[in-house]
């Protein structure tokens, strides 16, 4: 049955145009959604409706005004949709939601020891750390990598590695909550003068616990050996127990200092951190700066000599602290380690006598020079060539005072055609660095002298090796020094399948013995391994570098 047609058109009866096609409108976006983003489906519908062409006008052309109004409405809606595409930025959290997302922070994955580089762009400018996964990202603006990470993964809490401020992304507001103070302290530890002065007091052998419940002692923590950087670890362990240098690095503000000083200061403060999340630290950040500054002379992938590295490190640290190349004592490094040495040189000439015999004659004049030193090199006697009755090599022993006689001013050392004598001058520095020379190179191989150096950890009298000066030090009075740190070399056999094929029969391993002044106990630090050791066993290893501290006047040695 066919549909009956209408007798009259609706427009003729009502006198109005046909109702125009209404588009979906959004009222007050901020009131309805409270700063949240519209669903993706609704935004897609709005775009689709906005792109539809308007209905054609009727034959009388009575819908032109409606068409213009609809075009204006479409333009307004398109502008509104563009504004609603990005999440809204906020200057402050909503009332009652100031701790939003803080429960997502995972402290067990946070590690601020590595170099601050964006994991996407590798940039070191304006770097933020995600407190949920621990990764580094650059910036926090709408087009930054941290912003995209917050949208894609749903990690919302970030900390600025330079200012230590915490932000929530993508909203962008700063979070001020006392529960975040422990994270800020681990990222950049800061100490008061009273806390630093109490580190070495007797009876202050403090204990601390990491997040996992592991007990550790601040100042005596393991250091990560990334590959072959144990030579660096032992040097930093020794320097971190030199009180004047340590206190200077922990208390001064190095925000405008060169990167070498800034990163060393952060590493030393982390070594002495009593509220650390982990019971060890990683020197990666400082090693990267050292590798860059030394033109890859010292890296984390190749073994180096600790004395060679310490010499380079102290000289560059002296310059970075504003020290002068000509003026002595112009930095903390020189005030702690630098001393004066008198060198007497006498030339030796070879002549033939009447019987055509070669005779050596000493020059009548003796030239005396005063030089400044940072290290005192001690020469070991040559190792014996013969074996004992069991056909084993004899490992000789020599006391420390015997090899120190090089600096008594009487024993001569011959170098080519010159005879030299050495004598220390007053005043001696607060700390002495002894380099026990064990390695020598010839045209073919590097030789190692395994001689054991015996010593007492306390009561080393340096007065016999110093030229008397009554105006500085009383005649006949001892000058006591006590051992602070002892770097020991250990030769370890390599793997037969790898290193033996390459011709390496043994490899070098370094460890550091440091004194805990609070409990008067000795601690051995070898990479991540930290354990106590009796003081009677200190000299059994192959000592290579020693740090001795001058005892203050009136302080009695007891142990």
What are these regions (language model features)?
Residues 2-559:
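UBL (ubiquitin/ubiquitin-like) substrate-recognition surfaces
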């Amino acid at each position: 049955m066919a549909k009956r047609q209408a007798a009259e058109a609706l427009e003729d009866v009502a006198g109005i145009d046909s109702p125009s096609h209404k588009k979906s409108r959004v009222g007050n976006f901020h009131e309805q959604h409270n700063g949240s983003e519209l669903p993706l489906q609704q935004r897609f519908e709005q775009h689709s409706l906005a792109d539809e062409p308007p209905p054609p006008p009727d034959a009388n052309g009575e819908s032109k005004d409606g068409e213009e109004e609809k075009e204006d409405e479409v333009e307004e809606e398109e502008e509104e949709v563009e504004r609603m595409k990005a999440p809204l930025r906020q200057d402050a959290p909503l009332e009652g939601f100031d701790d939003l997302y803080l429960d997502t922070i995972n402290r067990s994955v946070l590690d601020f020891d590595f170099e601050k580089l964006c994991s996407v762009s590798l940039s070191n400018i304006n770097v933020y750390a995600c407190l949920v996964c621990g990764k580094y990202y650059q910036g926090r603006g709408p087009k930054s990598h941290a912003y995209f990470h917050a949208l894609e993964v749903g990690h919302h809490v970030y900390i600025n590695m330079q200012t230590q401020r915490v932000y929530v992304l993508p909203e962008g507001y700063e979070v001020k909550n006392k529960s975040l103070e422990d994270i800020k302290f681990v990222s950049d530890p800061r100490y008061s003068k009273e806390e630093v002065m109490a580190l070495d007091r007797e009876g202050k052998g403090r204990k601390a616990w990491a997040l996992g419940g592991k007990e550790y002692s601040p100042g005596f923590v393991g250091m990560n050996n990334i590959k072959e950087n144990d030579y660096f670890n032992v040097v930093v362990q020794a320097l971190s127990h030199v009180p004047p240098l340590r206190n200077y690095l922990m208390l001064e503000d190095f925000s405008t200092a060169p990167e070498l000083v800034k990163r060393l200061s952060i590493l030393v403060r982390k070594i002495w951190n009593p509220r650390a999340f982990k019971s060890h630290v990683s020197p990666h950040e400082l090693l990267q700066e050292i590798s860059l500054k030394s033109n890859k002379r010292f890296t984390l992938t190749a073994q180096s000599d600790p004395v060679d590295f310490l010499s380079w490190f102290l000289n560059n640290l002296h310059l970075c602290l504003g020290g002068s190349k000509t003026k002595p004592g112009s930095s903390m490094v020189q005030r702690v380690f630098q001393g004066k040495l008198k060198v007497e040189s006498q030339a030796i000439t070879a002549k033939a006598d009447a019987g055509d015999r070669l005779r050596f004659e000493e020059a009548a004049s003796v030239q005396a020079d005063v030089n400044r030193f940072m290290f005192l090199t001690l020469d070991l006697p040559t190792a014996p060539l013969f074996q004992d009755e069991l056909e084993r090599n004899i490992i000789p022993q020599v006391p420390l005072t015997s090899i120190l006689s090089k600096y008594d001013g009487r024993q001569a050392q011959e170098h080519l055609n010159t005879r030299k004598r050495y004598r220390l001058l007053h005043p001696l520095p607060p700390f002495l660095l002894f380099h026990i020379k064990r390695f020598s190179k010839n045209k073919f191989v590097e030789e190692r002298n395994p001689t054991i150096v015996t010593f007492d950890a306390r009561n080393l009298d340096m007065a016999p090796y110093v030229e008397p000066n009554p105006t500085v030090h009383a005649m006949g009075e001892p000058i006591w020094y006590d051992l602070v740190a002892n770097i020991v070399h250990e030769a370890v056999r390599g793997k037969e399948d790898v290193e033996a094929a390459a011709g390496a029969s043994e490899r070098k391993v370094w460890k550091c013995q440091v004194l805990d002044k609070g409990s008067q106990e000795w601690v051995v630090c070898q990479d991540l391994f930290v354990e106590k050791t009796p003081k009677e066993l200190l000299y059994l290893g192959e000592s290579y570098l020693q740090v001795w501290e001058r005892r203050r006047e009136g302080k009695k040695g007891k142990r």
